[in-house]
């Protein structure tokens, strides 16, 4: 835990950006969930005891799957793949976009407490926002009409948003941030990706 606190103090700017992004994701999710509740004529609180317990369970499963990541053979070594979004997607379909964002946040928080960070929070921020770019649109679409057909459409919408956002986020923020963190020219990082 001391190592994590030391990393936080050394990377205050990234931590502040991370916190601002978390707040932004929560606000978007709240607006979408309230809109879906209004359209469907539902008036239940965003959080209740049952939801909080389920958020904890889905987050724990997601964190375990997140820790069991593996490298992608066709990408640079710092890109990893895991299946941690699956339980979060199921949980957000069941409990809404706000619960999905909360699960993403708790997953990353648990991972940081157990494993720490090796990327000065850059990779953790990336995992959170790219995960939210899948979870928020998918669960929002599904929240408006909970049918099998709409679940498929929601997954397609979430995948499209995640792909477009993830690509842009990599180009505009992540790759330059990794370049700065590792002290490598951006061209060298891009060359690592094109080598494979």
Where are these regions (language model features)?
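Loop-helix junctions at membrane interfaces
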Residues: 1-196
């Amino acid at each position: 835990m001391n190592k994590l606190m030391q990393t936080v103090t050394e990377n205050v700017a990234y931590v502040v950006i991370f916190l601002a992004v978390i707040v932004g994701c929560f606000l978007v999710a709240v607006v979408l969930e309230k809109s879906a509740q209004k359209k469907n004529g539902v008036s239940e609180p965003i959080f209740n005891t049952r939801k909080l317990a389920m958020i904890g369970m889905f987050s724990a499963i997601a964190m375990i799957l997140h820790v069991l990541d593996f490298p992608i053979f066709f990408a640079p070594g710092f890109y990893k793949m895991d299946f941690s979004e699956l339980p979060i997607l199921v949980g957000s379909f069941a409990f809404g976009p706000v619960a999905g964002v909360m699960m993403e946040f708790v997953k990353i928080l648990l991972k940081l407490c157990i494993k720490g960070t090796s990327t000065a929070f850059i990779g953790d921020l990336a995992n959170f926002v790219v995960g939210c770019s899948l979870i928020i649109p998918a669960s929002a679409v599904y929240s408006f009409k909970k049918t099998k057909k709409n679940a498929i459409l929601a997954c397609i919408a979430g995948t499209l948003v995640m792909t477009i956002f993830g690509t842009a986020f990599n180009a505009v923020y992540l790759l330059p941030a990794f370049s700065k963190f590792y002290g490598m020219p951006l061209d060298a990082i891009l060359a690592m990706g094109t080598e494979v």
